[in-house]
């Protein structure tokens, strides 16, 4: 059973539009399979040749989970954990049907912010040794891009030149 708070798998990869997969070409296993599948569907590449189309990623992840026999429970939020004698026995979840309890032998916290682990009493740390966390990333989709910029190479060169000059704010005039 996989409990997902969104209406698709992938978390920030899909719902958060966080599409760059840095160093993906040097990976094997499921990551290579993922890149190969997205490439075959013309859904891989983008700005730095490390991005993908989120809708295809959603499909890939769901297909993999279902083919492995995973039951998916979408739009369901973690609501609490049942711990007995230091062992997590199950989780409470909440969705439009109300609150439900699921007992399990192996429970993995994939909340992204360790809610389940924290509620179960696990020790955790946040940030680096000084408590600093990675800054937020703003991701967005842009349409109507002129053809010459679609492969990303020309735009990449413009950005590289701007950074080399130390320019952080610039305007790109599209003609």
Q: Where are the regions that the model predicts?
A:
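Conserved beta-strand positions in the Rossmann-like core of class I SAM-dependent methyltransferases
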Residues: 1
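Core beta-strand elements of the Rossmann-like FAD/NAD(P) dinucleotide-binding domain
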Residues: 95-106, 110
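Rossmann-like dinucleotide-binding core of oxidoreductases
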Residues: 116-175
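Short, solvent-exposed loop/turn segments at the edges of secondary structure
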Residues: 86, 111, 133-137
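Short, hydrophobic/aromatic-rich segments at coil-to-beta transitions
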Residues: 85-91
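Conserved N-terminal/central alpha/beta ligand/cofactor-binding core
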Residues: 4-84, 134-135
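Glycine-rich phosphate-binding loop of nucleotide-binding enzymes
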Residues: 89, 110-111, 115
């Amino acid at each position: 059973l996989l409990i997902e708070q969104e209406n698709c798998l992938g978390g920030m990869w899909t719902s958060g539009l966080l599409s760059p997969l840095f160093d993906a070409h040097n990976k094997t296993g499921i990551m290579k399979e993922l890149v190969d599948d997205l490439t075959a569907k013309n859904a891989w590449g983008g700005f730095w040749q490390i991005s993908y189309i989120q809708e295809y990623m959603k499909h890939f992840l769901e297909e993999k989970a279902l083919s492995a026999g995973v039951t998916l429970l979408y739009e369901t939020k973690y609501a609490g954990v049942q711990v007995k004698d230091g062992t997590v026995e199950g989780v409470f979840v909440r969705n439009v049907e109300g609150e439900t309890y699921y007992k399990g032998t192996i429970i993995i916290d994939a909340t992204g912010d360790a809610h389940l682990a924290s509620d179960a009493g696990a020790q955790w740390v946040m940030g680096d040794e000084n408590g600093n966390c990675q800054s937020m990333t703003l991701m967005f989709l842009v349409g109507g891009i002129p053809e010459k910029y679609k492969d990303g190479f020309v735009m990449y060169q413009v950005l590289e030149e701007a950074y080399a000059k130390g320019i952080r704010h610039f305007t790109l005039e599209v003609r």
